Regions:
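Sec-dependent bacterial lipoprotein signal peptides
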Residues: 1-7
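A non-transmembrane, solvent-exposed segment enriched in polar/low-complexity residues
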Residues: 9-166
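Short solvent-exposed coil/turn linkers within tandem alpha-helical repeat scaffolds
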Residues: 174, 178, 213-222
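Amphipathic alpha-helical repeat scaffolds of TPR domains
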Residues: 176-191
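N-terminal "domain-start" segment that seeds a small globular fold
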Residues: 222-256, 363-366
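Conserved redox-active cysteine motifs that mediate thiol-disulfide chemistry
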Residues: 259-260, 267-284
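Structural microenvironment flanking redox-active thiols in thiol-disulfide oxidoreductases
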Residues: 276-315, 325-332, 363
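Thiol/disulfide oxidoreductase modules built on the thioredoxin-like
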Residues: 316-317, 324-370
Length: 370
């Protein structure tokens, strides 16, 4: 409640003042965080050094959220903006990042505490030490030592994942009224989930709308609302978006060309190990439904045709295939976060099932194919 009251008044223009003595630059960038995990940021404003400081005058539409401030969109540090005037002072700078001391924003204190808790409680120091040993062994090409370190590391990573989720959940509950809670939910929970049915989409929408008013003013909330609309378009029961590409002979092939059949649509590429591990199960499915209106369509995001064709021949995956054109947004339209991603489309072109793997590639179509 105290934090909520501190962030309640955000409709005015706010100011970021930065003193970066020791940083060799005459310009700083304010960036929207596209992905903290991948380090992807998009510049939305810049400030020039004047009288020993940089000043950002934020517009009212700048939503409360985590931002990135640095001498480039890829070299800087994270700062929470919450509508308050804040002052940044250079704390430390390395080749990888910039550390800012932040004054005027209570959320930054909470965010810094979260980062420290996350590092400490998920064995950060131990994992860093093991990683250093692993890279040294790799430089020596000592495969035996690399394997030993990898085996020693796995329990820390496995337990670390569990501890991270518990810590994230606790911070979300404590900060549901402010942008930090909803940012943590978006970046560390929502982006790792899938919503294959309209019921799950509705439940998710109700949950994110249970966050406080300040949280719902953040860009994280807006991104989730937008994503849920996209999920509705590719939910089970909806018509599968069209897929267009070139087959192995260079001819155009469309998903709609297979209308009238039950189609397992397999999104994959040649360098995806887990994708190619599904090939035996796909072969079994093709054999199981032989003579029936059943097809498999491989949809590849490969960029090199030879690698794609070689993988098809090496694996013996002799069914319909197409390779997407560069820049095709079909993965986005199907709400795919990772591959392999296999769905079942009915004869009428509607999605019947999603996220199929292994034995499900036979068991699920078996419920429909007659």
């Amino acid at each position: 409640m105290i934090l909520f009251m501190m962030f309640a008044c955000t409709s005015r223009q706010s100011v970021i003042t930065v003193k970066a003595k020791g940083l060799n630059t005459g310009k700083l960038y304010l960036c929207e965080v596209i992905s903290e995990y991948r380090g992807i940021h998009q510049a939305i404003d810049s400030a020039i050094l004047k009288n020993g400081k940089f000043v950002f005058n934020l517009q009212e539409e700048t939503s409360p959220d985590l931002y990135f401030i640095g001498d480039s969109p890829w070299h800087g540090g994270y700062v929470f903006l919450d509508g308050n005037d804040i002052k940044l002072t250079l704390e430390n700078v390395t080749e990888e990042q910039i550390f800012w001391e932040v004054k005027g924003s209570p959320l930054n204190k909470v965010y810094r505490k979260f980062e420290k808790d996350l590092y400490d409680k998920t064995f950060g120091q131990i994992k860093d030490s093991l990683s250093t040993l692993f890279y040294k062994a790799r430089e020596r090409q000592d495969r035996e030592e690399m394997a030993r370190i990898k085996n020693e590391s796995m329990p820390y990573y496995d337990e670390g994942v569990k501890r991270e989720r518990m810590l994230v959940d606790s911070y979300i509950q404590e900060n549901k009224a402010n942008p930090l809670g909803i940012y943590l939910y978006y970046s560390r929970v929502f982006q790792r989930k899938d919503f294959p049915t309209e019921e799950e989409i509705t439940m998710e929408r109700e949950y994110i709308r249970s966050f406080g008013e300040m949280a719902q003013a953040s860009s994280s909330f807006m991104k989730m609302e937008k994503d849920l609309l996209r999920y509705e378009d590719c939910a089970i029961g909806h018509e599968a978006p069209e897929i267009i590409g070139k087959d192995t002979l260079g001819n155009e092939l469309r998903l709609s060309d297979l209308r009238g059949n039950y189609v397992l649509v397999d999104f994959w590429n040649s360098y995806c190990h887990w994708c190619r591990e599904e090939t035996p199960a796909l072969k079994q499915a093709l054999e199981h439904f032989a003579g029936k209106n059943f097809k498999i369509l491989g949809v590849s995001s490969d960029r090199v045709k030879k690698l794609w064709l070689d993988a098809i021949h090496e694996d013996g995956s002799y069914w319909d295939h197409l390779m997407l054109e560069k820049g095709d947004d079909v993965m986005d339209r199907y709400c795919i976060k990772g591959i392999p991603h296999i769905i079942l489309v009915g004869p009428d072109g509607k999605i019947l099932a999603k996220e199929l793997r292994g034995q499900d590639l036979i068991d699920v179509p078996d419920k429909f194919v007659k």
